[in-house]
From Swiss-Prot:
SUPFAM superfamilies per the UniProt record, alphabetical: ABC transporter transmembrane region (SSF90123), P-loop containing nucleoside triphosphate hydrolases (SSF52540)
Name under which the protein is recorded: ABC transporter aclQ
Cell location: Membrane
Membrane topology: Multi-pass membrane protein
Origin: domain of life: Eukaryota
Matches recorded under PROSITE patterns: ABC_TM1F, ABC_TRANSPORTER_1, ABC_TRANSPORTER_2
Family of the protein in this entry: Belongs to the ABC transporter superfamily. ABCB family. Heavy Metal importer (TC 3.A.1.210) subfamily.
Positions of the ABC transporter domain: 552-786
Glycosylation sites recorded in the entry for this protein: N460, N639, N797
Alphabetized PANTHER family for the sequence: ATP-BINDING CASSETTE SUB-FAMILY B, HEAVY METAL TOLERANCE PROTEIN
Keywords, comma-separated and alphabetical: ATP-binding, Glycoprotein, Membrane, Nucleotide-binding, Transmembrane, Transmembrane helix, Transport
């Protein structure tokens, strides 16, 4: 009796141990890989590939071995029932089938990588060694007499021994290249192996679902409503309702069987029918319990979406300027819109996938207890095949879906670029080119889309065929048992009802897995955004710059956007509080780079930038920027009213302050001439305003901000001469008592600057006042002479036109 219990336990423990070993190993490796990648070389890759080829053939032999063992067991159970041995049992048969499925699944081709068993597979093989050794001990413990029938038993014994040896060989082959490589790394003192190409190697099959889960763990804190106790209680109660739904799913077919069993008694079983109807009312997503759960979950789902999308938006705004300059706005916008994909994924995972898996395991256990192991085996086999085919085909569909999403992004990005560059497109008569370009991208998208839909229909047909085959086998088996008086008709009804219930979650899994893949592919870009780290951020212990006198110091500053091409080299200068400094030079000399460093869009590579003697890197970015006001060369306005754009600098400003700032910028009268005045819509990026109007709005906005340090990036470059003179006077007024740093193209606007810095190829070549630099007869003097000559020629031409 004790031996029989051990035998039964071994049969169930064998496949469970292998699968759990594999899954736990995958999870551990995924968590480890999140923090570290291993590095190997070309020698290791060559020998690893050879070892994997040998493992493939060994695993194939393993599958043949198990197939023979399954055949012998089935033969002994059905053709020669007089065979009495512990392995002639349904549990042993089920165990071998489960192990066969695991090994056979590993042999199927992967769409992304060639056959490459992972470290997790080796852990499962080690578990197989232990379990096969226990089976061998079971065989050796039998005391069957030698007879004709015992030859079959000894054949089974030989098959177990072969499997044990094969498992050991597979493990040895897997670890041998690793061991040899580690010895080479320890003993190597010179490059005897030739050139070694180091690269990160992942020993798990690429893109596994556990890797996805671990990768998305960055977003897990946004999924649980940790900021609301009320929402947490709602979520917990929803989980309780899920458990109740699982119980109801068992009771419905069981109660139907009871009703059918009592129908032949000559009386109507009203009570049992009422119980069945009540259970049916509670069952399913549209039942009473499911509806209550869905209503309770709505605020939890909304809270998750709000936290996720708001955090993503905040994170993108916190990223450094380099990220925004290097990304296409259409792609970033598309990624930010994928918060709903993760929200949908969470809802499906918690309330659809987990309940479905629970229902399938409960069904297998129910069939085992209520019927026998054959029914449980059939359910497990059909379920496994259904899920495996779904996941396996979804690997190909995932790649196709990713290709389709990439084509869609390119299509959307091209459309966004063309619309945002409307004037440029028409200036260059490029409308036909943009239309043809967009049409080509649409065709590429539809080609990828066709394969996605084709593979979906193929998957659905395969799933239906598998489930129909399983139902047919169960019906035939149950019908045979009923005809042999081994089961009652009521059990047939219960069986078919339960199978019908299982079809819904299985069919759902097909669509859900596809939906999950779509959601994860869609959300990959959002995850990538969260993984982006700002190059410039507050260091630990950074201080707040509460007050600022306005002293600015550049000390031996070096900086480069690309290390191969320095933008600034050994730049040093000081701007005293309340003084003005102008920076001039040819295009690409580094003028705008200095403003970017002042605003801390970038940090210096060497040297320091100091404000009132404090290194900019030692103060918080927000407090530093609160003392800076910028009038950029290219003003970008929000697609809102003029008033909104003006108040953006200081939302609490009064209308009188807004009017004063606009008068100082010579734009108030122009605004009042508009039909809607300050409520005039400026259009996308301010396209409804002229360049000069946008520039004056930017100047007025800076006046309203009233910073201690003014940064003017060719602030009057877009203005005509008359307006420039008006603005220049206003700029002189607001600059009194404030530090002003001006990037100038027109040298006539900076003649009164306390200090002029001349840049050439990232270096300071001259420094001084206007008069000093003219007297030096250097680069500044040449630039002045060139611009003066051009202005005189322009004025002369204008005079001739007036005379004519």
């Amino acid at each position: 009796m004790q031996l029989a219990v051990l035998t039964l336990a071994l049969c169930w423990a064998y496949p469970v141990t292998i699968y759990i070993s594999y899954l736990l190993s995958r999870l551990g490796i995924a968590l480890y890989r999140k923090h570290k990648d291993s590095t190997t070389g070309a020698w290791y890759e060559k020998h690893r590939k050879a070892a994997f080829t040998a493992i493939f053939w060994l695993q194939l032999v393993q599958c043949f071995d198990l197939a023979i063992s399954i055949t012998i067991t089935g033969y002994a159970m059905n053709i020669s029932p007089q065979v009495e041995a512990w392995w002639v049992d349904k549990e042993f048969l089920a165990s071998n089938i489960a192990v066969f499925m695991f090994l056979a699944a590993g042999l199927l081709p992967d769409p992304d990588v060639p056959f490459s068993p992972s470290l997790s597979h080796s852990h499962a093989w080690i578990a197989g060694i232990i379990m096969e050794a226990l089976q061998l001990a079971m065989f050796c413990n039998q005391q069957s007499p030698v007879s004709v029938l015992s030859r079959v038993e000894y054949l089974q014994l030989g098959l177990v021994m072969v499997r044990l040896v094969l498992f050991v060989a597979m493990v040895a082959l897997y670890f041998q290249p690793m061991y040899a490589w580690s010895r080479i790394q320890l003993d190597e003192t010179e490059p005897l192996l030739g050139e070694v190409d180091s690269k990160p190697v992942r020993d798990a099959q690429h893109g596994g679902w556990l890797d996805y889960v671990v990768g998305f763990s960055t977003l897990f804190p946004f999924l649980w409503p940790s900021d609301s106790r009320r929402l947490q209680l709602r979520a917990i109660f929803c989980f309780v309702l899920l458990v109740i739904q699982r119980v109801v799913n068992i009771l419905v077919p069981h109660q139907l069987g009871i009703v059918v069993a009592h129908l032949g008694s000559g009386t109507i079983p009203y009570q049992k029918i009422a119980i069945y109807i009540a259970l049916r009312a509670l069952q399913g997503q549209q039942g009473v319990i499911g509806s209550i759960r869905a209503l309770l979950w709505i605020p939890v789902s909304q809270s998750t979406y709000r936290r996720l999308t708001s955090s993503a938006f905040e994170h993108v705004l916190s990223l450094s300027l380099e990220f925004h300059l290097g990304k296409r706005i259409g792609e970033v916008m598309s990624a930010l819109s994928k918060g709903s994909a993760l929200n949908t994924f969470l809802d499906g995972l918690v309330f659809q996938l987990f309940p479905m898996v629970a229902d399938l395991w409960i069904a297998a256990l129910y069939f085992l207890i209520q019927f026998d192991a054959f029914y449980s085996l059939i359910v497990i086999t059909v379920t496994w095949l259904y899920l495996f085919v779904t996941i396996y085909m979804a690997k190909y569909r995932g790649r196709a879906r990713r290709e389709m999403v990439n084509r869609e992004r390119e299509m959307e990005a091209a459309k966004t670029d063309a619309l945002m560059s409307y004037e440029t497109v028409h200036h260059n008569s490029a409308v036909p080119h943009e239309i043809n370009r967009f049409n080509r991208l649409v065709q590429a998208f539809q080609k990828a889309e066709y394969f996605v839909f084709f593979s979906l229909n193929l998957l659905n047909a395969t799933q239906n065929l598998l489930f129909t085959a399983g139902v047919a086998i169960v019906c035939l088996l149950c019908a045979y048992q009923i005809s042999a008086d081994m089961q009652q008709v009521a059990m047939f009804v219960t069986l078919l009802t339960y199978l019908a219930q299982l079809q819904a979650p299985l069919n759902f899994f097909g669509s859900f897995y596809t939906q999950v893949q779509n959601n994860l592919v869609d959300a990959e870009r959002m995850l990538a955004l969260f993984k982006e780290k700002p190059l410039v951020q507050d260091r630990d212990g950074a201080i707040d710059l509460n007050t600022c006198a306005g002293r600015v110091e550049f000390t031996h500053v070096n900086f480069a956007y690309d290390e191969r091409r320095p933008a600034l080299q050994d730049v040093s200068f000081t701007v005293e509080p309340g003084t003005s400094t102008a920076i001039v030079g040819e295009s690409g000399s580094g003028k705008s780079t200095i403003l970017k460093l002042l605003f801390r869009f970038y940090d210096v590579a060497a040297g320091s930038v100091r404000f009132d003697g404090v290194d900019a890197r030692d103060m918080t970015i927000a407090s530093l920027r609160s003392h800076l006001g910028v009038v950029p060369q290219d003003t970008i306005l929000f697609n809102d009213t003029l008033l909104y754009n003006l108040l953006y600098a200081r939302p609490q400003a009064t209308m009188e302050e807004v009017y004063a700032a606009c008068r100082a910028a010579s734009i108030h009268d122009r605004i009042m001439s508009f039909p809607d005045g300050y409520e005039t819509k400026v259009g996308e990026r301010g396209l409804r305003l002229s360049g000069g109007e946008k520039q004056r709005i930017a100047i007025a906005r800076t006046f309203l901000r009233s910073p201690q340090i003014l940064l003017l990036d060719e602030a009057t470059a877009s203005l005509d001469s008359q307006t420039e003179r008006q603005i220049q006077g206003a700029l002189d007024n607001i600059a009194k008592g404030r530090t002003t740093i001006t990037i100038a193209h027109r040298l006539s606007t900076i003649t009164k600057a306390n200090q002029i810095i001349v840049l050439h190829q990232g270096r300071i070549v001259e420094k001084g006042t206007h008069e000093e630099l003219l007297a030096a007869n250097g680069m500044y003097s040449q630039m002045w002479a060139k611009q003066t000559k051009a202005k005189e020629k322009k004025d002369s031409n204008a005079t001739l036109v007036e005379v004519a």
